[in-house]
Amino acid sequence: MAADATGASAATGAAKTPGAADAPGAAGGTGAAGAAGAAGGAGGAGGAGGAGGAGAAGAGLHSRHRAVLPDWLALYYDRPIEITHGEGRHVWDAEGNRYLDFFGGILTTMTAHALPEVTKAVSEQAARVIHSSTLYLNRPMVELAERIAALSGIPDARVFFTTSGTEANDTALLLATAYRGSNQILAMRNSYHGRSFSTVSVTGNRGWSPTALSPLQTLYVHGGVRHRGPYAGLTDERFTEACVADLEDLLGHVRPPAALIAEPVQGVGGFTAPPDGLYAAFREVLARHGVLWISDEVQTGWGRTGDHFWGWQAHDRNGPPDLLTFAKGIGNGMSIGGVVARAEVMNCLDANSISTFGGSPVTMAAGLANLSYLLEHDLQGNARRVGGLLIERLRAIGAGAAAVREVRGRGLMIGIELVRPGSGEAAPEAVSAVLEAARGGGLLLGKGGGHNTSVLRIAPPLSLTVAEAEEGASILERALHCA
C-alpha cells in the first residue's frame, strides 16, 4: 500500500488553534448531547449493526423525488434513505434504522447532531426575529464576524457572509478579479469549488464541472494530488520543486492572473493534499506577480484536520492567504458561508451590494453557539487525537486489503482510495459496493475522488469518541470484503 499522502502522522504535533480553550479531559468527553456517551448510543429500531434498506415509504418518496427534482441531483445508495432525526454522531432513517454518521451531511454537521447549545440559540433567535437583511444592523452578524476575523489570521480582516460555500467562492472570485482587473484564475487540477457559473469553471474535476462556458479564463496547475500524475514518484521536496517550476513556467506564458484558488486538502477530489509548504512556495512566486491567494477552507476549516485550525496553516511560511472562504461546519447544519479578506481587497468594489439571506440573525446565532462550543471543548484537539487513532486503525485494515491503494488524511478528514487489485486502476464500482455494505452495517460514509470516484471519504462530527471510531472502523473492515 502506498505511503501516506500527507507526510507526518496526523496524531502528532501541537495543534494551532487560535483562541481555543484547554481540552476538557479525555477525547470522548466533548459534552455533546444524547449519543455522546458510548458507541452503542441511544437505541433505535434496527440498531447500529444491522440497518435495513428503504421500505415502501422510502420507495414512494424516491419516486416522488425523481418526478419533481433534477436527474443530475445525486443520491447515495441503490435504495436511498430518508434521514428523519439525529443525535450526537448518530442519525435515524424513516424505517427506524440507526446509523453512525461518518460523513456529517458532507462535512456540515461538524459538532454533533441536535447539539442543545445550537438548537437553543436558533430557537431563541427565531422567537425574536428571523430575518432583517443586511440593510439593518444585525448584532449576531457583527459578533460572529468579529470572532471569525480574529481567528482568520488575516490582518485588517473584513468578513462577508453568504449562504453556501459556492456563493462564498463566487464572491471571492468577484473580489479578486475586480481588485486585479483580470478575469484569469489559476486553479488546481482535481479541485472542486462549487456549482455556480463561475465556480464550476474553476473546478478541475470534470465529473463536477458540467460546462466549459465561463466568465473566467482558468489555468490549471499541478500540486493538489500527491500520488498520481507526472510528479507522483518524486520525494516531497522534489515534488514541490517541480510544481513550483511548472507554475513559474506557466506565468511566463500568460498575462498576470487575478488569483490562485486552492483547497489545502481537496474535498470532493478525495481528501488528497500536497506536501506541507507547497502553497507557501507558490505564494512566493505569486507575490512577485501580484497574484492573490484564495484559500478555499469550506471543508478544511474550523479544526477538522486536527493539526491546524485552518488548512492554510500547513503552508504558512510566507503568511496567510489574501482571501479565505468558509462554509459547511461553522453552522453545524445551518446555511452559513462567507469570505474573509484584508480590507483593501474586500473594499475594492465600487458599487453597492447587499445580501438578502447571508448573515441572517438565525444562522448567525447558530454559528456563534457552534463556534463557542467548538473552541470551549477543544474539538480540534479531539479531531487530532481520535482522528490519529482512526487513521492508524484504518491503515492496519488497509494493509490486509488488496483493493486499498492508500489510506490518507489528517484529523477527521480521511480518504481510503480503492483500486482493482494488481492493476492500480481506479475502482468506482468497489467504492459503491463498500458504501452499500457499510450502510447495511449501520455506517454512513461519503465518496469522491477525481479518478472516477474511487475514494471513500470519512468525515464524522468532530466530537467523535474513541469507542465510536472503533465501531465505525470495525463496520468498515467488514464492508471492505465487498470491494
Regions found by a protein language model. Give the residues of each.
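Small-residue-biased low-complexity repeat regions
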Residues: 1-56
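Conserved N-terminal phosphate-binding loop of PLP-dependent enzymes in the Aspartate aminotransferase
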Residues: 2-3, 55-483
